[in-house]
Amino acid sequence: MSIQTTADSRMIQSIFQVVLVSLLVLGSVRWILDELKSKESRISKLYGFRQKEAVFVTKEDQLDESCNVFEGQWVWDNVSYPLYTEKSCPYLVKQTTCQRNGRPDSYYQNWRWKPSSCDLPRFNALKLLDVLRNKRLMFIGDSVQRSTFESMVCMVQSVIPEKKKSFHRIPPMKIFKAEEYNASIEYYWAPFIVESISDHATNHTVHKRLVKLDAIEKHSKSWEGVDVLVFESYVWWMHQPKINATYGDTSEVREYNVTTAYKMALETWAKWFKTKINSEKQKVFFTSMSPTHLWSWEWNPGSDGTCYDELYPIDKRSYWGTGSNQEIMKIVGDVLSRVGENVTFLNITQLSEYRKDGHTTVYGERRGKLLTKEQRADPKNYGDCIHWCLPGVPDTWNEILYAYLLRSHRNFF
């Protein structure tokens, strides 16, 4: 009887211990969950957003190191493209909305860039937003770069609830925010990268240009600490073979050969890069020149037109027009090679050279206004073969940027 009582007592004691441990474990788990919930609540109250659930980036999403995404061809794809439409994206400016402005065809929207040795990962807005979680992505440059910024905003904005996104204009910047990710996509107007008299975002002189080749501080204050920086500067340099500029004493204005001035400006940028960029925390990209298609005789010998009314890409492999300055290309390559591996060169020039069909031509703006009926009838004088329609070619530049961002991304769960 005594032995049985002792056994029962031990069993009860064991059960009690198991129950007690279970309660302690459950209590600890509950406390941790409550703390996490409380922390999220505090973050939500402080920043006005709730963190969006993470999306997993797989190995299949990431480019192989050996893949050259800049060599390939344009293939027709009217199933997967465009990635968005003019109607679906309220952030496009009139300069790029060619369909809305009267362009009769939409073929330019349905070409997909296919690298020769690999495939670009299919663009996924949720995955990009997860890569940009708690980060800032900033595009810096001229109006071509502004189109790249607008393209990227249009590519991601449709997956974000209306009340969880915002768009702010704070000259010389534009800022798109995805609140659930605490992420922003931004644009900074700096057509020469270094300082100039054309730095006002809207009221800038086009013909009288004066560049301060050794001055970058005014701009760079807005770049410091940004997680992903994408630089571009070309078209504004190419208005004339020579350009007025200063170096040192701002009262001494000299006339420089454009390529000489460009090199001096880029070296000023490189000095800033080496002293201010934290390569462990920041990613920096530099985009090559966006080509122009001003003279049709370059791809169609004997003709005397422009890019107006062009419907298809150039199919001549390695085509290179006179609008893309080879010396500037070499300067960029030399300066970036001295900066080292901490900057990624987005060499979009060759793939964009083929796209004579993608420009706004007479379906854009001139000096802030849409072309008149009379001006549209004169594409040789009024057609814009510099800027691009959206959706269009800049979307591909962003798909390539997306591929590079995915390649370096590490999941944290």
Swiss-Prot record:
**Sequence motif DCXHWCLPGXXDXWN motif, residues:** 384-398
Record keyword Zinc-finger present: no
Q: Major place of localization?
A: membrane
Q: Which GO terms describe its biological process?
A: xylan biosynthetic process
Keywords, alphabetical = Membrane, Signal-anchor, Transmembrane, Transmembrane helix
Report the GO molecular function annotations. Answer: xylan O-acetyltransferase activity
Q: Per the Swiss-Prot or TrEMBL record, what residue ranges does the short sequence motif GDS motif cover?
A: 141-143
Highest taxon of the source?
Eukaryota
GO (cellular component) term, any one: membrane
- Task performed by this protein: May act as a bridging protein that binds pectin and other cell wall polysaccharides. Probably involved in maintaining esterification of pectins. May be involved in the specific O-acetylation of cell wall polymers.
Q: What else is known?
A: Contains 2 motifs that are conserved in esterases, but it is unlikely that this protein belongs to the catalytically active pectin esterases.
Please give the family membership noted in the entry. Belongs to the PC-esterase family. TBL subfamily.
Q: Please identify the protein, giving its name as recorded.
A: Protein trichome birefringence-like 31
Q: Which gene encodes it?
A: TBL31
